[in-house]
Regions:
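A contiguous, surface-oriented mixed alpha/beta subdomain in the mid-to-C-terminal portion of proteins
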Residues: 4-167
């Protein structure tokens, strides 16, 4: 949040670790794209709602519109080559089998502004249950986060380099 203080000024936001989740209202969507506007504190005052209510409503609407998805990155890459839809691992009941250190993509079904799913209650906890281990959350874009299980072999400098490379 510190590096984006100017942009976040006058906008309600929720801190998610080192990231800040702010709120947007979708005003139009068609085959050419989606248009949205950032919610401001003055809008909240006009509506007579608190930041807590805004967050609760936004999370419910986001989940209803586009559920949380966790994909194996290899399957996502294969989708672009072979047009095979990757399995959404987020809805599994049993832990994932992590033989090697895979990279997962955390997003939403629409793959639009999907990094925001990390602000939804219980999402990061569910990822921990599925992985059965600690993990790193690496920012990739506003549309997705990379999830990397911690097997103890990665150094902070390697993770930082990975984030720079992806971005």
């Amino acid at each position: 949040p510190e590096t984006n203080q100017e942009y976040l000024k006058g906008k309600p936001y929720t801190s998610c670790g080192e990231l800040a989740a702010y709120y947007r209202i979708q005003v139009a969507a068609d085959e050419e794209g989606t248009a949205s506007v950032a919610v401001t504190e003055s809008m909240m005052q006009m509506w007579g709602i608190t930041k807590e209510q805004l967050h609760k409503d936004a999370m419910q609407a986001a989940h209803a519109r586009s559920p949380v998805c966790l994909y194996d990155m290899e399957e996502v890459m294969a989708e672009s080559i072979f047009s095979v839809k990757p399995e959404n691992l987020f809805n599994r009941e049993e832990p994932l089998d992590i033989g090697f250190v895979p990279i997962y993509i955390l997003t939403n079904q629409d793959k639009l502004n999907g990094a925001s799913v990390s602000a939804q209650e219980g999402v990061l906890e569910k990822v921990a249950e599925l992985l059965g281990t600690n993990y790193y959350v690496l920012p990739s874009s506003i549309h997705e986060l990379l999830i990397l299980p911690d097997n103890g072999s990665m150094q902070l400098s390697e993770l930082e380099a990975m984030v720079r490379e992806v971005n």
